[in-house]
Amino acid sequence: MCGRFTLTVDPAEFQDKFGNFTFPKNFAPRFNIAPTQPVLGVPNNDRFKADFFMWGLVPMWAKDPSVGNRLINARGETVAEKPSFRGSLKYKRCLIFADGFYEWKAQPGKKSKIPFYIHMKDRKPFAFAGLWDTWNSSDGSLIRSCALITTEPNELMAMIRRMPVILHPRDYAKWLEPSAQTPDQVSPMIDPLSRRGNGCVPGQHAGQQSVYRCSELVVPAK
Protein backbone atom coordinates (compact mmCIF):
# COMPACT_ATOMS: atom_id res chain seq x y z
CA MET A 1 0.00 0.00 0.00
CA CYS A 2 1.20 3.51 -0.80
CA GLY A 3 -0.24 6.05 1.62
CA ARG A 4 2.10 9.04 1.36
CA PHE A 5 4.21 10.58 -1.40
CA THR A 6 5.96 13.81 -2.37
CA LEU A 7 6.12 16.28 -5.23
CA THR A 8 8.79 18.84 -4.45
CA VAL A 9 10.44 19.64 -7.78
CA ASP A 10 10.48 23.14 -9.25
CA PRO A 11 7.63 23.64 -11.79
CA ALA A 12 10.07 24.78 -14.51
CA GLU A 13 12.20 21.65 -14.12
CA PHE A 14 9.04 19.59 -14.05
CA GLN A 15 7.92 21.00 -17.40
CA ASP A 16 11.31 20.14 -18.88
CA LYS A 17 11.05 16.55 -17.65
CA PHE A 18 7.52 16.04 -19.00
CA GLY A 19 7.56 18.27 -22.06
CA ASN A 20 4.64 16.56 -23.78
CA PHE A 21 2.22 17.71 -21.09
CA THR A 22 0.90 21.09 -20.00
CA PHE A 23 1.12 21.88 -16.28
CA PRO A 24 -0.06 24.65 -13.97
CA LYS A 25 2.51 27.44 -13.98
CA ASN A 26 2.91 27.39 -10.23
CA PHE A 27 2.45 24.72 -7.60
CA ALA A 28 4.05 24.65 -4.18
CA PRO A 29 6.41 21.84 -3.15
CA ARG A 30 4.61 19.16 -1.16
CA PHE A 31 6.50 16.89 1.19
CA ASN A 32 3.68 14.78 2.58
CA ILE A 33 0.77 14.18 0.19
CA ALA A 34 -1.94 12.16 1.92
CA PRO A 35 -5.21 10.49 0.89
CA THR A 36 -8.18 12.83 0.23
CA GLN A 37 -5.75 15.61 -0.72
CA PRO A 38 -5.37 16.93 -4.29
CA VAL A 39 -2.73 15.26 -6.45
CA LEU A 40 -1.35 16.33 -9.82
CA GLY A 41 -2.18 14.06 -12.74
CA VAL A 42 -2.93 13.78 -16.45
CA PRO A 43 -6.09 11.89 -17.50
CA ASN A 44 -6.44 9.94 -20.74
CA ASN A 45 -8.74 12.48 -22.38
CA ASP A 46 -6.38 13.17 -25.29
CA ARG A 47 -5.60 16.72 -24.09
CA PHE A 48 -2.29 15.99 -22.26
CA LYS A 49 -3.14 18.68 -19.71
CA ALA A 50 -2.41 18.15 -16.03
CA ASP A 51 -4.99 18.90 -13.38
CA PHE A 52 -5.67 18.04 -9.76
CA PHE A 53 -7.54 14.95 -8.57
CA MET A 54 -8.69 14.00 -5.09
CA TRP A 55 -6.65 11.00 -3.95
CA GLY A 56 -9.15 8.23 -3.21
CA LEU A 57 -11.26 6.92 -6.09
CA VAL A 58 -15.00 7.65 -6.00
CA PRO A 59 -16.65 5.54 -8.74
CA MET A 60 -19.33 7.34 -10.69
CA TRP A 61 -21.95 4.90 -9.34
CA ALA A 62 -21.02 5.36 -5.67
CA LYS A 63 -23.82 6.44 -3.33
CA ASP A 64 -21.47 8.42 -1.09
CA PRO A 65 -18.09 10.04 -1.87
CA SER A 66 -16.69 8.83 1.45
CA VAL A 67 -15.99 5.50 -0.27
CA GLY A 68 -12.92 7.20 -1.71
CA ASN A 69 -11.27 7.13 1.72
CA ARG A 70 -10.86 3.36 1.29
CA LEU A 71 -9.95 3.32 -2.40
CA ILE A 72 -6.55 5.00 -2.50
CA ASN A 73 -4.76 1.94 -3.94
CA ALA A 74 -5.76 -0.71 -6.49
CA ARG A 75 -3.87 -4.00 -6.47
CA GLY A 76 -2.50 -4.69 -9.94
CA GLU A 77 -3.21 -8.40 -9.63
CA THR A 78 -6.96 -7.89 -9.15
CA VAL A 79 -7.64 -4.43 -10.58
CA ALA A 80 -9.36 -5.87 -13.67
CA GLU A 81 -11.81 -7.82 -11.49
CA LYS A 82 -12.81 -5.39 -8.74
CA PRO A 83 -16.06 -3.49 -9.47
CA SER A 84 -14.61 -0.27 -8.04
CA PHE A 85 -11.66 -0.29 -10.46
CA ARG A 86 -12.33 -2.39 -13.55
CA GLY A 87 -14.29 0.32 -15.38
CA SER A 88 -11.56 2.88 -14.84
CA LEU A 89 -8.88 0.41 -15.92
CA LYS A 90 -10.73 -0.01 -19.20
CA TYR A 91 -11.74 3.59 -19.85
CA LYS A 92 -10.13 6.05 -17.40
CA ARG A 93 -6.41 5.75 -16.78
CA CYS A 94 -4.11 8.57 -15.69
CA LEU A 95 -0.58 9.50 -14.70
CA ILE A 96 -0.05 10.73 -11.14
CA PHE A 97 3.18 12.68 -10.65
CA ALA A 98 5.60 12.35 -7.74
CA ASP A 99 9.29 12.47 -6.91
CA GLY A 100 9.26 10.05 -3.98
CA PHE A 101 7.05 8.06 -1.65
CA TYR A 102 7.09 6.78 1.91
CA GLU A 103 6.82 3.27 3.26
CA TRP A 104 7.25 1.83 6.76
CA LYS A 105 9.05 -1.37 7.75
CA ALA A 106 8.00 -3.31 10.82
CA GLN A 107 10.65 -3.97 13.48
CA PRO A 108 10.57 -7.44 15.06
CA GLY A 109 9.39 -7.22 18.64
CA LYS A 110 8.60 -3.51 18.44
CA LYS A 111 5.43 -1.53 17.89
CA SER A 112 7.22 1.27 16.06
CA LYS A 113 8.11 1.02 12.37
CA ILE A 114 11.13 2.32 10.47
CA PRO A 115 10.14 4.96 7.90
CA PHE A 116 11.74 4.89 4.45
CA TYR A 117 11.68 7.49 1.70
CA ILE A 118 11.93 5.93 -1.78
CA HIS A 119 12.99 7.98 -4.79
CA MET A 120 14.86 7.74 -8.08
CA LYS A 121 18.64 7.72 -7.75
CA ASP A 122 18.83 10.95 -9.74
CA ARG A 123 16.00 12.50 -7.64
CA LYS A 124 14.01 13.21 -10.81
CA PRO A 125 10.19 13.14 -10.80
CA PHE A 126 8.26 10.19 -12.22
CA ALA A 127 4.69 9.06 -12.85
CA PHE A 128 2.59 6.48 -11.04
CA ALA A 129 0.04 4.42 -12.96
CA GLY A 130 -3.33 5.74 -11.84
CA LEU A 131 -7.06 5.32 -12.38
CA TRP A 132 -9.57 8.15 -12.30
CA ASP A 133 -13.30 8.76 -12.33
CA THR A 134 -15.83 11.56 -11.83
CA TRP A 135 -18.70 11.64 -9.35
CA ASN A 136 -21.67 14.00 -9.48
CA SER A 137 -23.51 14.94 -6.30
CA SER A 138 -27.21 15.75 -6.07
CA ASP A 139 -26.38 19.46 -5.83
CA GLY A 140 -24.50 19.35 -9.12
CA SER A 141 -20.98 19.53 -7.71
CA LEU A 142 -18.32 17.35 -9.30
CA ILE A 143 -15.53 15.32 -7.70
CA ARG A 144 -12.70 14.10 -9.89
CA SER A 145 -10.74 11.45 -8.03
CA CYS A 146 -8.01 8.87 -8.52
CA ALA A 147 -6.29 5.78 -7.12
CA LEU A 148 -2.73 4.49 -7.47
CA ILE A 149 -2.11 0.98 -8.78
CA THR A 150 0.23 -1.14 -6.67
CA THR A 151 2.22 -4.23 -7.57
CA GLU A 152 4.58 -6.84 -6.16
CA PRO A 153 7.81 -5.24 -4.89
CA ASN A 154 11.09 -5.18 -6.78
CA GLU A 155 14.30 -6.34 -5.07
CA LEU A 156 14.76 -3.06 -3.24
CA MET A 157 11.21 -2.83 -1.94
CA ALA A 158 10.89 -6.51 -1.04
CA MET A 159 12.43 -5.83 2.36
CA ILE A 160 9.62 -3.39 3.10
CA ARG A 161 6.33 -4.18 1.34
CA ARG A 162 4.40 -3.71 -1.92
CA MET A 163 5.08 -0.72 -4.13
CA PRO A 164 3.15 1.61 -6.43
CA VAL A 165 3.45 1.03 -10.17
CA ILE A 166 5.95 3.52 -11.60
CA LEU A 167 5.48 3.73 -15.35
CA HIS A 168 8.39 3.76 -17.77
CA PRO A 169 8.33 6.97 -19.87
CA ARG A 170 7.96 4.89 -23.03
CA ASP A 171 4.60 3.67 -21.68
CA TYR A 172 3.05 7.06 -20.94
CA ALA A 173 1.32 7.34 -24.30
CA LYS A 174 0.03 3.77 -24.17
CA TRP A 175 -1.30 4.22 -20.64
CA LEU A 176 -3.04 7.43 -21.69
CA GLU A 177 -4.64 5.89 -24.78
CA PRO A 178 -8.15 7.44 -24.75
CA SER A 179 -9.90 4.43 -26.27
CA ALA A 180 -11.06 1.42 -24.24
CA GLN A 181 -8.28 -1.03 -23.37
CA THR A 182 -8.48 -4.66 -22.31
CA PRO A 183 -6.61 -6.01 -19.27
CA ASP A 184 -4.28 -7.87 -21.64
CA GLN A 185 -3.34 -4.57 -23.29
CA VAL A 186 -2.45 -2.73 -20.09
CA SER A 187 -1.22 -5.50 -17.78
CA PRO A 188 2.34 -5.57 -19.25
CA MET A 189 2.80 -2.03 -17.93
CA ILE A 190 1.77 -2.97 -14.38
CA ASP A 191 5.15 -4.29 -13.27
CA PRO A 192 7.59 -3.24 -10.54
CA LEU A 193 10.24 -0.80 -11.71
CA SER A 194 13.75 -2.23 -11.80
CA ARG A 195 15.80 -1.66 -8.69
CA ARG A 196 18.42 0.07 -10.80
CA GLY A 197 16.32 3.20 -10.94
CA ASN A 198 15.43 3.46 -7.26
CA GLY A 199 17.10 4.84 -4.18
CA CYS A 200 15.92 4.17 -0.66
CA VAL A 201 16.88 5.98 2.53
CA PRO A 202 15.50 5.99 6.07
CA GLY A 203 13.51 9.17 6.58
CA GLN A 204 12.76 11.49 9.48
CA HIS A 205 9.14 11.20 10.68
CA ALA A 206 8.39 10.08 7.12
CA GLY A 207 4.96 11.57 6.92
CA GLN A 208 2.92 9.06 8.87
CA GLN A 209 0.88 11.99 10.12
CA SER A 210 -0.46 14.13 7.29
CA VAL A 211 0.12 17.30 9.35
CA TYR A 212 3.87 16.99 8.76
CA ARG A 213 4.59 18.97 5.61
CA CYS A 214 8.11 20.34 5.95
CA SER A 215 11.22 19.51 3.94
CA GLU A 216 12.74 17.72 6.95
CA LEU A 217 10.54 14.76 6.09
CA VAL A 218 12.82 13.80 3.22
CA VAL A 219 16.14 14.29 5.01
CA PRO A 220 17.87 10.97 5.75
CA ALA A 221 17.75 10.03 9.42
CA LYS A 222 21.05 10.18 11.28
Feature locations, PLM:
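Short linear sequence motif anchored by a di-proline
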Residues: M1-K222
